[in-house]
């Protein structure tokens, strides 16, 4: 079950580069793992961060499920003994322009494209629309000092990948469980691929590195 301690412990032992968890603020002011608002007991993010201390080579993608958590999550990570390079943000992130000060700028952001282009997933799949979106998000990334955009795999067309690449913007693509599609995106230079098929992903990555 995702967002459970059992899932976290399993993911940490798979050899994956990063673990993704859903983060929100509980009613008692404690950061928890939960996709939706809940009254039930949930895993505390502090417990997960403590577990992460045993895996210094692994990163944790905190998928923020509500706005305004950037400072609190960073502070908790530091208190828990993690380096800021070990955490990254996706989800409901509100980026700050590079011309302004930002206490959490040292945390890498995988910026969800719908945070800037809210109608992107309502559009019909047309290469021209996605190409235009790639130019728009690339310009916005420069404004906010962001280097990686997080998109659903249906948006990761050849044109979208080409345009973002030409603008020095990396891609994080979700959720790719099909091996053929995984290999295709890897071959196109996609920086990060989120998958539930961790065994397949690790095997493909291992083959790529040894070849």
Where are the regions that the model predicts?
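Phosphate-group recognition and catalysis centered on beta-loop-alpha active-site segments
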Residues: 1-211
């Amino acid at each position: 079950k995702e967002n459970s301690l059992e899932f976290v412990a399993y993911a940490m032992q798979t050899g994956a580069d990063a673990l993704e968890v859903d983060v929100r603020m509980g009613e008692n002011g404690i950061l928890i793992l939960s996709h939706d608002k809940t009254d039930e007991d949930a895993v505390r993010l502090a417990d997960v961060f403590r577990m992460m201390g045993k895996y210094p080579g692994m990163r944790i993608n905190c998928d923020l499920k509500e706005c305004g958590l950037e400072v609190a999550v960073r502070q908790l990570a530091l208190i828990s003994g993690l380096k800021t390079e070990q955490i990254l943000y996706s989800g409901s992130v509100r980026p700050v322009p590079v011309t302004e000060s930002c206490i959490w700028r040292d945390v890498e952001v995988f910026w969800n494209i719908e945070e800037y282009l809210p109608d992107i997933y309502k559009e019909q799949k047309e290469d021209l629309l996605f190409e235009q979106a790639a130019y728009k998000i690339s310009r916005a990334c420069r404004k906010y000092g962001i280097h990686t955009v997080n998109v659903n795999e249906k948006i990761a067309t050849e044109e979208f990948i080409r345009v973002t690449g030409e603008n020095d913007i990396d891609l994080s693509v979700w959720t790719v469980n099909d091996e053929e599609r995984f290999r295709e995106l890897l071959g196109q230079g996609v920086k990060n691929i989120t998958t539930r098929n961790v065994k397949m992903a690790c095997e493909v990555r291992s083959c790529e590195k040894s070849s």
